[in-house]
Amino acid sequence: MSSPEIETLTQALAKLPGLGPRSARRAVLHLLKKREAALGPLLRALEAVNDKLTSCHVCGNVDTGDPCGICADPRRDARMLCVVEEVADLWALDRSRLFPGRFHVLGGRLSALEGIRPEDLSIDLLIGRIAAGGIDEVVLAMNATLEGQTTAHYIADRLESFPVRLTQLAHGLPVGGELDYLDEGTLAQALRARRPVS
């Protein structure tokens, strides 16, 4: 039987995506076995993340500054806005270095099954950014899932009255695929072949 501290750590790790109780227990045992090489650096990294990272009030990205480095970068094309579901999607697209504009993170996607409604996402903030003017194109970069496409259609309907070009990523993306898991070549092709939302 393990100590309460080990059980607490195991339960905390098991809440992370992709880790169940058995994987979490193996991770805890590894950290304890390699205490100086693994546990110390992990603790320092977690502390730094907790102390220094914040959510950008403009786009929802996670960074050390607010506004984030992308929103504050004058080299970014402020006329282009790419809307993504999660921060991981923003990072995946930004790694491709093909999108010259700025981003907007919704914080999820619409889902009747999970009870996620439009007011649960940062859609109103997105509408406000577009209503403020200066944006010529909005790229809807939702995942190719039912919920992702439902979210894209909802946003397209909300943006219908705005004078912006509305495009979405080409569907060379696999149906059911998530942006964070795609290679940069696939993402690059999807960005290049984006098309108007109909």
Swiss-Prot record:
Highest rank taxon of the organism: Bacteria
Molecular function GO labels: DNA binding; zinc ion binding
Recorded coiled-coil stretches: none
Keyword annotations: DNA damage, DNA recombination, DNA repair, Metal-binding, Zinc, Zinc-finger
Gene3D superfamilies with a match to the protein in the record: 3.40.1360.10, 6.10.250.240, RecR Domain 1
ZnF segments: C4-type: 56-71
Keyword DNA repair: yes
Family per record: Belongs to the RecR family.
PANTHER family, per database record: RECOMBINATION PROTEIN RECR
Stated role: May play a role in DNA repair. It seems to be involved in an RecBC-independent recombinational process of DNA repair. It may act with RecF and RecO.
The protein's name: Recombination protein RecR
